């Protein structure tokens, strides 16, 4: 065995050994329990970042732990390869997105392999490959035929200069990110998935997910947003019907969760796109201008909370069905046309947003809820105004004195008797629009025919292949400019027709990739039925909390769609979910001449610390001049505070990177980058190597201790007790708790005790062998390369075949224990007694200690309290 720890030599050798043995290449095996471990697959952006390293190391630790415990472990890897960044990079570098993507995949795959992950690379999948998205298109056509996928108009951001649709994140302060042009809102036909048909099941099945973080489930519940309320129809006043047709000329419909406050409504507000708004604006330029302003604004619901609330009165009126009050209709920018009815009733006295709006525009506030003796002040909002639980109705005629639920039922009865409303359960969740007016995505398999309408592409003509030799120019959809792509024959009538040139939302690919991994080369369907039956759901899923809503919700939705198509036999895709924290690092900057910030990489900064080790100043190494310490933030390109994993691996080895990532913080918490922490991790691995080296230097490896320990010295018994207590703890830390930092700390403590123990002689050497073999197996999931190498030196066999160490229960039973002695609650000494010592023996031994004699000062004991196995407290 070489004396020095050299990761550059041992890591490739260990990886070759695993690859040659194909230990991570798995197939269905009914003789073993299965374990499907999956970390969210990466977008091939070019290089791995530290967040990737942390994410995939967590999955690898769990996979290797289960492998040693006899499970048939599948840990696949692939690439979430479609998306806008590839198009942006293509325009910047004048290269096709496909070429850019495939180059990145090759480089990142090399990086992943260098980290030694236990990945079954035979299952590798890239979502931009036709053999993958063919089946996505196939499912789309099936669901289109069933009506679960449908087409309707949707609002998009239109850049009039670049002549293209922009994503919300490409709109900056209302202008296109490339052209700088003011963005327009346009209605265009788009395809939608009826996720609302599954809203109730998606909500209820969250209760099945016992091993998901409660925070994630709460976020999904709020996103689905089930509410019980009432539809209310306000009759349109006779003098306000001009320009309106059909039901819009009869009534204005709203949905409210607070029908108990209906008597307090003082106006109603509609979206800019509402027919009543259009009718009112027909001859009013000021209304037309406001409507145009609203349509140019953001369509994102998230922006509604922070944006300034604006409105304009229409001069049109509707009638409150309960009290006959005539309420003016306002056009308001906070009402969204795509949500509900595009209209809301406003009760300023009991809704904070309405209160602020009414205050701004001097609209009336009518109190209809009272809570105790609290006085209503229309000049200042108070929290109790919106109290549903404790309020009772006032100023509401025969409804006065009713609580919320009683009032809800009474209002429902009144409205239903008039045909003016009824109770309704509603969801915040909206159908999922999947059309994207971009190039680098999965083509939507629809043909538009003037005779036959929208026709799904037949299965035998799939996939509709995306041309890969295209370099986008940012000026509209490339596919819409390619007759060779869009010109086709109608599958129904054979006449001239046109392919759909929109592509699918990239969340589509990530909504089912975990099923494709089960049989990635299966050519007769989305997933091989036998493989789907064996692997079932993912046992452990790992990814960031930022995916709590969209990706995880869509993946759950797709699982139910595929189940209903008979493709899989599970209701939920992920049994257990771990949401790892971010990797964060200090940030530094200098202000530039333009008032902006030039961010400086931490590696280029030199710090000065106070006597407590806290940074107090920083200078740039290159010029010695000060830089601003800006605090700790997530590693990112924009803040220039990232650390290249490849540099870390080159300097210290993959095992050091893995160990630091697992030891620096519990997996669900943020991990703060620390150069000293990395160096500390490397020191520990050198120590581990040195410990085994010194042991083998004293003689050849022996058979690890096993059997009765009656003949062992107390010191060796204590070491074995520590060893097996550590094994039990680490097993629990890996399996149930998933807290890897405490597992590492436990092994460090074990090695500390090993260093202090005399392991000379035949028995001592056998116990030493047992300790070192076990420590190496306990650490293999985290630092597999060094452990694989040390195991071969200690044992000569293959570590992955050795199995997880078992706990010797006999070793956990101590013949002697240490008990604290207190006098009047203060520690005055310790005694070593037999583990089964009686209460009387413990009392006698405690009273005889030097500390007890000294501090009792000759006084008799009033009481002696014995806590078995822990302490004796003498009260005088």
Curated annotation (Swiss-Prot):
A motif ('HIGH' region) lies at residues 42-52. Its main location: cytoplasm. A motif ('KMSKS' region) lies at residues 634-638. ATP binds at residue 637. GO terms for cellular component: cytosol. Transmembrane segments: none annotated. It is found in: Cytoplasm. Pfam families: Anticodon_1, tRNA-synt_1, tRNA-synt_1_2, tRNA-synt_1g. One of its GO terms (biological process) is leucyl-tRNA aminoacylation. It catalyses: tRNA(Leu) + L-leucine + ATP = L-leucyl-tRNA(Leu) + AMP + diphosphate. Belongs to the class-I aminoacyl-tRNA synthetase family. HAMAP family: Leu_tRNA_synth_B. This is Leucine--tRNA ligase. It comes from Neisseria meningitidis serogroup B (strain ATCC BAA-335 / MC58). The gene is leuS.
